[in-house]
Regions:
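Conserved small/polar residues in nucleotide/adenosyl-binding loops
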Residues: 184-190
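Short, solvent-exposed aromatic-acidic interface loops
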Residues: 173-175
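Membrane-cytosol interface segments of multi-pass membrane proteins
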Residues: 1-136, 141-153, 164-168
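Active-site rim beta-loop-alpha module in soluble metabolic enzymes
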Residues: 178-182
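Interfacial segments of multi-pass membrane proteins
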Residues: 155-159
C-alpha cells in the first residue's frame, strides 16, 4: 500500500499538478528536479501492481466464497472509478481509462472460469477464457490492460511453484523497470 501511495503521489501531485504549473515549467532547474522526483516516485510505485496480482491469486485460492470475493472487488472498482478519473484524468468520469481494480476483477473472473473449465478437462476453453479476458481488459482500457490479466493468469497457473511464479512474473512485467523486484519476496524461504 505504501508503494501504491508513492506511485499515486507521483501521478497526481507531480504529473497532474506541479509539473503543469507555468512558473515551475519556466524554471528549468526546478522543473528537471521535480520531473526526476516524479520518475523516482513512479519507479517505486511500479512494484505495487505485481504484488496486488500475487495477493489476488492467493486470495482466490484461500477464500471461502469466490462469488462474494468477485462482488466485493466489483463494488470497489465502481466506488474507486470516480476518484481515479478525477485524480488521473481530471474529470468526474472518463471512459478512456479504467482503474486497476477492473483489471484485477477481470483477472479474478478469468481465474474462476479457467478453474471451472480445468475441472471439466477443457483446456481449449481455458485458453479462450484467457484470450477473451485479455481482450476485455484491452477494450475497456483498464489500468495495465491485457498485460495485467496475463500476469494474474500466469501467477495462477504457476501457483504451486514459487520459482516459476517469480520467473513468469518477472518476464511478463519486464517492460516495467522495477516490477520484477516485486517477486523477490517469493524466493525467500517460508517457515
Amino acid at each position: 500500500m505504501i508503494t501504491m501511495l508513492i506511485d499515486h503521489i507521483g501521478a497526481c501531485v507531480f504529473e497532474r499538478g506541479l509539473l503543469l504549473v507555468d512558473e515551475i515549467r519556466n524554471d528549468a532547474a526546478l522543473f528537471e528536479m521535480l520531473r526526476n522526483t516524479d520518475r523516482i516516485l513512479r519507479l517505486i510505485g511500479r512494484v505495487s501492481f505485481p504484488i496486488f496480482c500475487f495477493l489476488l491469486v492467493e486470495g482466490f485460492l484461500h477464500t471461502h466464497d469466490r462469488k462474494k470475493y468477485a462482488l466485493r472487488l466489483f463494488l470497489f472498482a465502481l466506488v474507486s472509478e470516480i476518484p481515479f478519473d478525477l485524480a488521473i484524468m481530471g474529470r468526474l468520469f472518463d471512459p478512456v481509462h479504467q482503474n486497476v481494480f477492473f483489471t484485477l476483477l477481470i483477472g479474478l473472473l478469468a481465474m474462476m472460469l479457467c478453474d471451472y473449465f480445468r475441472m471439466q478437462a477443457q483446456p481449449v476453453a481455458q485458453v479462450l477464457v484467457l484470450i477473451l479476458a485479455m481482450v476485455l481488459a484491452w477494450a475497456l482500457h483498464t489500468d495495465y490492460g491485457y498485460r495485467g490479466v496475463l500476469l494474474i493468469e500466469l501467477l495462477y497457473i504457476f501457483r504451486y511453484d514459487r520459482m516459476k511464479q517469480v520467473v513468469a512474473g518477472a518476464v511478463a512485467f519486464s517492460w516495467e523497470t522495477t516490477a520484477p523486484v516485486s517477486y523477490t519476496h517469493l524466493t525467500l524461504p517460508t517457515t
